[in-house]
């Protein structure tokens, strides 16, 4: 508690009087819990009309999810999917509130988080529907690393920005869950995506390492946090070793997971940034530099359009766009030359993937049409993160959680 109070003021935002027009443009999305309710491109198996013979076979589950995602019409109602609030969405809203200095929104958001089906207890979070990918099945009510990290970071950011150490303690519980339940030690250390899969997925590993390192650093630089710091760094180095000569990473370690896309690359960079801020490790910084150069050079068009793959740009996806704005803006705040990229992607996104009347996001843009389906977690939540990070960058400020971590680690001297 004492440590938390000591750093809480360091990261605190200055309050409502400093909010820029960027927040007004964001429509104060994070302040209205009802706006967090919606459907998801991967929620097909939440549909009450999906028959058991589909649910009982892995391949059919995957087909159902992919059809729902790819059909350019909203099938949620036909499938019987009721709009719902996702834990990860609330985590993003908490982080956005922290960046805007909007402490008043935090109690309602933490209440909404507790009410989600993805809030599983013990610091673990998951998705509210069954997910079948080409490499894993994780049912509703099972923890996964991505949801856990985004919620935990939202809680930690809200705790730092509002001076509420209990929220940082909740984030530390999530990090403890990742450390104890998702850590694989052999043949090399890494953090697993789910409890049941042994696949090494690099973006999950980097984000898990970032969460563990971040919360350990906030806990103080002493013998009690040394094992967590060491484990996080070792896990990050496992995926750093998988970085290719051009600075890219495959999605995962298996041969059939060799693709590289925009938003998972951004997740890699985000996780690496957190590890570097928490440790100052030169090996992490070198890998991050290489990854940023590749991402900047190969994943964006001249107007800021976010390519899906370097060699196959379409579709331009709102998740790629929002994540790119967020990560590029935060990298720029720490000295990387990505500020202009964040601005270009933001301008392109507002023109092409945001409804000008409601502010709701569109799913994807293709050559001759825009898929205007609205998915809150996939689109609104990540664009809210991007808008909030860009607002801070324009004001010459940094993410309050990242400031607290960097000050605790010594990466950012107290005088800065």
Residues covered by each model-derived region:
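Glycan-recognition and catalytic cores of secretory/periplasmic carbohydrate-active enzymes
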Residues: 6-416
């Amino acid at each position: 508690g004492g440590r938390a109070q000591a750093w809480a003021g360091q990261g605190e935002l200055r309050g409502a009087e400093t909010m820029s027009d960027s927040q007004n443009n964001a429509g104060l999305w994070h302040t209205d819990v009802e706006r967090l309710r919606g459907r998801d491109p991967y929620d097909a198996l939440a549909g009450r009309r999906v028959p058991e013979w589909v649910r009982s076979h892995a391949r059919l589950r995957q087909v159902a999810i992919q059809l729902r995602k790819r059909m350019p019409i909203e099938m949620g109602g036909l499938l019987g999917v009721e709009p719902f609030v996702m834990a990860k969405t609330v985590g993003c809203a908490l982080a956005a509130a922290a960046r805007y200095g909007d402490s008043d929104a935090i109690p309602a958001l933490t209440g909404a988080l507790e009410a989600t089906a993805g809030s599983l207890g013990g610091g673990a979070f998951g998705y509210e529907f069954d997910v079948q990918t080409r490499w894993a099945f994780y049912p509703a009510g099972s923890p996964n690393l991505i949801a856990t990290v985004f919620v935990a970071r939202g809680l930690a950011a809200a705790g730092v920005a509002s001076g509420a150490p209990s929220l940082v303690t909740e984030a530390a519980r999530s990090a403890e869950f990742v450390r104890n339940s998702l850590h694989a030690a052999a043949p090399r250390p890494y953090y697993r995506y789910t409890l049941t899969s042994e696949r090494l997925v690099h973006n999950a590993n980097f984000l898990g390492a970032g969460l563990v390192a971040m919360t350990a650093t906030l806990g103080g630089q002493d013998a009690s946090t040394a094992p967590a710091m060491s484990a996080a760094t070792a896990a990050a180095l496992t995926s750093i070793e998988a970085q290719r000569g051009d600075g890219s990473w495959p999605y995962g370690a298996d041969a059939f997971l060799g693709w590289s896309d925009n938003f998972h690359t951004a997740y890699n960079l985000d996780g690496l940034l957190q590890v570097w801020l928490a440790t100052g490790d030169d090996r992490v910084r070198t890998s991050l530099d290489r990854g940023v150069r590749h991402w900047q050079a190969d994943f964006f068009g001249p107007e800021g359009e976010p390519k899906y793959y370097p060699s196959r740009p379409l579709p331009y996806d709102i998740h790629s766009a929002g994540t790119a704005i967020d990560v590029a803006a935060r990298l720029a705040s720490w000295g990387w030359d990505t500020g202009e990229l964040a601005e270009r992607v933001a301008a392109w996104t507002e023109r092409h993937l945001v409804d000008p009347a409601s502010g709701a996001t569109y799913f994807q843009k293709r050559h001759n049409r825009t898929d205007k389906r609205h998915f809150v977690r996939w689109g609104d939540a990540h664009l809210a993160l991007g808008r909030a990070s860009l607002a801070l960058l324009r004001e010459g400020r940094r993410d309050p959680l990242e400031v607290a971590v960097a000050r605790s680690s010594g990466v950012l001297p107290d005088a800065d």
